[in-house]
Each structure stands twice: as C-alpha cells, then as structure tokens.
From Swiss-Prot:
This is Pentatricopeptide repeat-containing protein ATP4, chloroplastic. The keyword Isomerase does not apply. Residues 1-17 have a biased composition (Low complexity). Pfam families: PPR (PF01535), PPR_2 (PF13041), PPR_long (PF17177). Residues 24-33, 61-76 have a biased composition (Polar residues). It comes from Zea mays. It is found in: Plastid, Chloroplast stroma.
Length: 691
C-alpha cells in the first residue's frame, strides 16, 4: 500500500465550492476599522461577483477595494437579538432627529413663524407626545418665549394624550429662569385651553414663586389646590412651609408641618430642614433643636443640608457647645462637610469668641484651599481684636494681603479691626503703622478707627495725640457718635487733672449735653445742679450707651475723689433701671453683683452696700443672713486692663475686709455673717471704704 503523504499542498486544502468572502466576516474586536458594517435581519449577505480564489497578480490575498469598503452582519430574523438590533437602529435615528429639532428650535428667531418652520421641517409627520417632551426638555436652555411658542405648536400638531404634561415641562423651564409673570400668563392660557392642572403643576408654580422671592404668592397658590382637586405632596409642603417662614408667618408654617405629620406623611430631610430654618428665623432655637432630635428618633437620617441648617441655627443662638456636638455627630455619621459647613462653624465660633476652635476651622479651610472671602476674614479679625489674639490676627492679616483673589483682600473693616487690636494692647507703634498702611491702600480712616486710636493714646497718657486724632475726625467730616463720645469720656476718666481740660473740650465739641455734665462734675461746688443734669443726660441717652456713660462718669468721680457725686449717679442709674438687680437677697445669702461695672462704679456700689449693711446692724430691723457674697465675674474687664476680680481682691485686702475668694465659685468673694458683723462694728460708717 502506498503510504499517505504527511502533508498536502495548500491548494489541496481549499474547498471546491464557493465560500464566504473575507469581506462578509464580522470582527467585533476591531470597532475602529474604517470599513462600514451593514446590519440586516432580512437580507442575506451579498455574494461576491468573483468567487474564484485570488490570482497570482494579488499575492496578498486581499479583495479589490470596491468590495472591501463594506461589511455586513446578517442576523437571523428569528433570533432573539433581532428585535433588540432593530430597536437600537430605530432609536438611534430618532434621537438624532429629536436632537436636531431641539438645536433648530434653539437657533431660530423668537417668532411664531420661525418656530413653526423649524418644527415642521424637523417633523414631517406628527410627532408623538414623548417626542414633544424630549424636544422641550432638550431645548430648556433656549429663550422662554421660544419654548412657549414651541409648546403651542406641539399642542396643535403632536399626538398629545395629556396636555398638562407639556405645560408642566414649560412651567419648569420658566421656574428655572425665575420668570413669574410669564408663569402666570402660561397658567391663564392653560385654563383657557381647558387643561386641568395636576399636583406637578401646582408644585412647579409654588416653587417658582418661592424662587422668585414671592412668598405670599406661593401661599396663595397653595390655597388654590383644593379648588382644582389637588393634594400637596412632600415637596409642596416643604416649599410652602418655607414660604410661610419667609413671609413672617411662622405659626402658619408650623401648623402646616403639624398637618403633614397628622396626615401620616413620611418626614424627609427636606421638610425637616425647612422647619428647622423656620424655627431659627423666628428665634425659636429650642424648637429647631427639638425637630432635629425628633427626625432622628423616627429614623430620618439628617443629610448635609440638615446639618448645615442646624449648625447655622445654633450659631445664631450663641450655643457653640451644641455646634461642636452636632459637628462631631456629622463626622461620626460620615457626612462629608462642605464649604458651607465650615462657614457655619466659623460664624458660630467667632460670634461666641471661641478662639481656638475658630482658628482650627480657619486653618483647616486654608489647608483645603477653600475660598475664604473678606467677610469671613473680618469675622475672624473682629474676634481676635476682642479676645486679644495678636499673633493669630497678624497671621490672618498676612494671609489676606497674600491672597490672589480680589474678594479676599483687606478692606476698611479689616484695617479697623487691626487698629482696634493694637489699641486694646496699647501698642501705639503698631496701631499707627496699620493706620498709615490703611491710608496708603486708599481707605480713609472711619470713626471706628479713630475711636480705637484715641482709646490707645488715652491708655498711654498721650493727651495731645488724643486732641490731634479728634482734629482728624473733624477734617474728615465725620460726625461723632455715642460710642465715640463714650470713648472720650473713658479717656477723661484716666487723664491727669492738669490735662483734663483738653479732653473735656473735645467732649463738649462732640456732645454739648455730655460736656456740660462733665464740667459740673469737675466743679466741686455744683452738687445739686450736677445731680439734675446727670439724671437728664442718662434719661435722654440711647439705651445702649446709658451704662457706659454712667460707668465712665463714676470712674471720673472716684478719680477726682467726688464720692458724693458718684453716689448720686448710682442712685439715678438705679431709679432709671440702668443697673438692675445689683443686690439680691435670700434667706441664706445676700449678694452684690458687680459684673459689667467699671472699677469706679463697682467701688461706689460696694461703698453704698456696706453702708446699708452697717445701717441694718445699727437699727436692728433685719439681721444678716448666714452668708454674704460679692460677685465680680472673671476675666478681663471692659474698662480696665486688669480683671475686676483682681482689682477687688487687692482693694478688699486694703480694707482688711473678711471677704475671700471662693475656691469653688470663680469670681465670687464670700464671708460669714459673724465675720462681717465683727468687721462692720469695728469700723465707723464713714470709714468702711476708702476710694
């Protein structure tokens, strides 16, 4: 038997029947090929005209170019894939047609004829309702007038089952552009067309009124809902609750919230955030906190908006400890803070003068490259000026000047805070340097800057510079206000007698009535006239300056050893209710409350109180309680570089008074009735206090 060959020539392997050409094969792994692929679920792939194998003249085995430009994928019509392929092909063409229609609509003129021509060209056949919705939604960036004209064309030419759907699409466009008058006009057209509005219509119109700031209109449209047989949903409730709150009708907002709860609506973060905001706006911060705790108790998880709203509310309430708790909870719940979160934290901590916390938030924002505008910077600088954070303020001020954004550069308030900071620490050179820098930056000194500068000069005893700064006020055409006059009065209280006339002249030129009272105070022969003039001054002054005026006048009396006039001022202040609840009495303790008083006012009050105690012992009408206490508060005093507690401790030692600082009650000095009685009896009434 002849042996079979181990291999055959390639030509012997080719089949003898016509085979599918290479051009009809399908290669999905090469989608970038320039060859076009035709998909057919009906036609068989075209047969090549030349089924013979490639000739020797084409050694690479490729087909002629006329046959290699087209690829065909034949899909069996009975295959499950056939319907999907057909839908995909049809959907692609429809999307392209609708996108082209939307583009044409956006490019045409805002006239009825232009819109009609564009849509007729795009839709030779009547479009469906869905086509109309897609085109109107896609063309949402177009002009509102064009959208309304397109709506009218679709209503007249499309196969529309529910006209209200198309109206709602255009109403949402008007809401986005905040066009209230156009919204009302389209509503009227809708009713004339006999179209019944639905819940989505009312929700859109109400939220449009809210977005336009027309909160009374939002409430008005909410009241129309029952007339058309519509019931509000959660979004509508939320929008109207917010509208009631902004309209100042917090009671109606809360009634609506209670109604939503009574009707078993599932509370969501949107409604809760809105109610919290209503409570915060009306000043009911406990109510805001209750809603926040209630939503968590029923399983509604607070989102970022709710947390930010609560942080803002508690910051307004001056409850920084609650702010810290909420922020800690927010971090524990893995809710990612936003820039608004950190702004709320800064607001809360700077207002409450939580220096360390505020600076920590500031540095975090700086590290995260968050935008810090001049308003936030100024809040930080104001806090630093009040609590004496010199190094921190200088760091912030350097950051402001180094900032690249124009919205972060120092303004007049920034310079004012820096001058106030240096003035409070009696750093004259730095205060003057900031003032010069302010002028070079193109800002004129305002009354706050000059007030701080005068206070600084007064602290270091530079009376001539006080007068020079007062002249700057007049040169700039600035009218002195009550705060400025109070500053001059404070400077006068610490000015030596030989230079007092210079400051009194400035006071008289700023406020004639105040200057007259100070002149009578200095004149030792005018006791009765001073009493009447001082009473009239305190009675006619604004409420916020009554106590500062009284404090400074009593300081001046004490420094000039005019105790009779100081007592007259205290009596007038108590009768006018300026000093309220200075003394409190219980069965176990009599207390003197001096917190907020200047040193001179506190010493005068102590003088009067101890004389009253001595009188009680002499008459025997009323025995002393087991405990006597003096509350001075703790920390720095507004009217002195030293705290009132430190001043009083030294003064009580000079008097050899038996009051001692309480170890468990900061700012309190206590004694027993036995020790007080022995000390009072050892002193004559006129010797009780030497001031």
């Amino acid at each position: 038997m002849a042996s079979l060959p181990l291999c055959r020539s390639p030509s012997s392997l080719l089949p003898s029947w016509p085979h599918r050409p290479i051009s009809a094969s399908f290669n999905p792994k090469n989608p970038s090929s320039p060859v076009a692929a035709h998909v057919s679920v009906q036609e068989t792939p075209p047969q090549p005209q030349d089924p013979s194998p490639p000739s020797d003249s084409n050694p690479n085995g490729t087909r002629p170019s006329s046959s290699s430009n087209t690829r065909f994928l034949w899909v069996n019509p009975n295959s499950p894939r056939a319907a999907d392929v057909a839908r995909a092909r049809a959907g692609s063409g429809r999307r392209a047609r609708l996108a082209s229609a939307a583009a044409a609509l956006g490019a045409c003129e805002t006239t009825e004829s232009a819109v009609e021509a564009a849509l007729q060209a795009a839709f030779p056949e009547p479009p469906s309702e869905q086509d109309a919705v897609i085109v109107l939604n896609t063309a949402a960036a177009t002009r509102a007038e064009t959208a309304v004209l397109a709506l009218r064309w679709f209503l007249g030419n499309a196969k529309v089952r529910k006209k209200v759907i198309l109206y709602n699409v255009v109403l949402k466009l008007l809401r986005k552009k905040r066009l209230w008058s156009e919204t009302e006009a389209l509503w009227a057209e809708m009713l004339r067309d006999g179209v019944q509005p639905d819940n989505a219509t009312f929700s859109t119109v109400i939220s449009c009124a809210r977005a336009c700031g027309l909160h009374s209109k939002a409430v008005e449209w909410f009241d129309k809902m029952p007339e058309f047989g519509c019931s509000p949903d959660m979004l509508t409730y939320s929008a109207v609750i917010d509208a009631y709150g902004h309209a100042g009708n917090s009671e109606a907002a809360l009634r609506l919230y209670d109604r939503a709860r009574a009707e078993k609506w599932q509370l969501d973060p949107v409604i809760c955030s809105t109610v919290i905001k209503v409570h915060s706006t009306s000043g009911n911060f406990d109510g805001a906190l209750n809603v926040f705790e209630e939503m968590k108790a029923i399983g509604v998880r607070p989102n970022l908006v709710v947390y930010n709203t609560m942080l803002d509310a508690m910051g307004r309430a001056l409850r920084p400890w609650v702010v810290k708790t909420i922020h800690r909870e927010m971090v524990d719940q893995q809710v990612q803070p936003s820039r608004a979160t950190y702004c709320c934290l800064l607001h809360a901590y700077t207002r409450a003068r939580y220096g360390e916390d505020a600076m920590a938030v500031y540095r975090l924002m700086k590290d995260e490259a968050m935008g810090i505008d001049v308003m936030l910077y100024n809040m930080l600088l104001s806090m630093c000026a009040d609590i004496g954070y010199v190094d921190e303020a200088e760091e912030i001020f350097r950051d402001m000047k180094a900032s690249m954004g124009a919205h972060s550069k120092p303004d007049s308030w920034s310079y004012s805070s820096m001058v106030t900071l240096y003035s409070s620490t009696a750093n004259v050179l730095s205060a003057e340097g900031i003032l010069n820098e302010m002028v070079e930056a193109g800002f004129k000194p305002n009354i706050f800057v000059l007030t701080s500068l005068i206070r600084c000069y007064g602290k270091v005893g530079r009376t001539d510079d006080v007068v020079r700064s007062f002249g700057m006020l007049q040169d700039l055409g600035i009218i002195p206000d009550d705060r400025f006059c109070g500053c001059l009065l404070s400077v006068a209280a610490n000015t030596p007698a030989e230079e007092l006339g210079k400051v009194i002249s400035c006071i008289e030129r700023s406020n004639v009535q105040l200057g007259a009272v100070v002149k009578l105070l200095v004149d030792r022969s005018s006791s009765e006239s001073f009493r009447e003039a001082a009473r009239e001054l305190l009675r006619s002054s604004r409420g916020v300056v009554k106590m500062p005026y009284c404090n400074c006048l009593m300081d001046l009396c004490v420094n000039l050893n005019q105790m009779e006039k100081a007592c007259a001022l205290l009596d007038a202040a108590q009768q006018l209710g300026i000093y309220a609840n200075i003394q409190t009495r219980t069965q176990t303790q009599w207390s003197l409350h001096l917190r907020g008083l200047s040193v001179g006012a506190a010493l005068t009050t102590l003088h009067v109180w101890m004389n009253d105690l001595y009188t009680s012992l002499q008459t025997g009408n009323e025995g002393l309680p087991p405990l006597l206490g003096i509350h001075t508060g703790q920390g720095k005093n507004t009217y002195s570089d030293r705290g009132l507690a430190a001043m009083f401790e030294a003064h009580l030692k000079e008097l050899d008074a038996p009051f001692h600082e309480a170890p468990d009650k900061a700012g309190w000095f206590l004694t027993t009735n036995v020790a007080a009685k022995q000390w009072l009896e050892s002193k004559a009434a006129s010797e009780l206090v030497t001031v």
